[in-house]
Regions:
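Acceptor/aglycone-binding surface of glycosyltransferases and processive sugar-polymer synthases
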Residues: 7-91, 118-127, 133
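Hydrophobic helical membrane-anchoring modules
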Residues: 12-18, 59-62, 85-173
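The conserved acidic donor/metal-binding loop of glycosyltransferases
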Residues: 1-4
Length: 173
């Protein structure tokens, strides 16, 4: 990894799943926003994170403190409830999977984590922001019944199974 997230916090992230309090747990740098700045988060990323998260919460009617932290834990059960195999292979996969969890009405537990910035992320921030906003807008438009994308077909009653590319047998996660 890039050293942004403390491995020692992993047991704290896994705990709510092990205690059946949640199926999805996010480490959030924005539960204590001043700590994000103290951890050297660049101001443009800090402001961008707040603005984009606000837009996403507004469109999705969610209340997450952050959509853009990569420190997350998903239970197998949660992954069986969403069609994540249709998600992007690029950086905005992180937003698509959150949107799916929100649509599926899964409980998302957030835990404050410290911010550490060292090596710079090498993705184009503008393109990432556009992709994230477009995915969120698409999910909102689908909820209004104006379009359909199987990626956002996350009815909470669905269970998804995946075909292994290695042996072509139907298997559950």
């Amino acid at each position: 990894g890039d050293g942004q997230y403390k491995a020692s916090l992993l047991p704290k992230l896994i705990s709510p799943i092990n205690k059946n309090k949640s199926e999805v747990v996010f480490g959030s740098r924005m539960l204590k926003p001043r700590d994000a700045l103290k951890g050297n988060m660049p101001i443009y990323k800090f402001i961008g994170n707040i603005v984009i998260t606000f837009i996403q919460n507004l469109f999705l009617r969610s209340k997450l403190s952050e959509f853009h932290s990569g420190y997350r834990v998903y239970s197998v059960k949660s992954l069986k409830q969403i069609p994540f195999q249709y998600n992007s292979n690029f950086f905005h996969f992180d937003t698509e999977i959150i949107i799916q969890f929100v649509i599926a009405k899964l409980k998302i537990f957030e835990i404050p984590i410290p911010t550490y910035y060292g090596l710079e992320w090498h993705a184009n921030h503008i393109i990432y922001a556009i992709q994230v906003c477009l995915a969120t807008l698409k999910a909102k438009i689908q909820k209004l019944g104006l379009i359909y994308d199987k990626k956002f077909d996350c009815d909470s009653k669905n269970t998804y199974f995946y075909i292994s590319n290695e042996n072509k047998n139907l298997e559950s996660l």
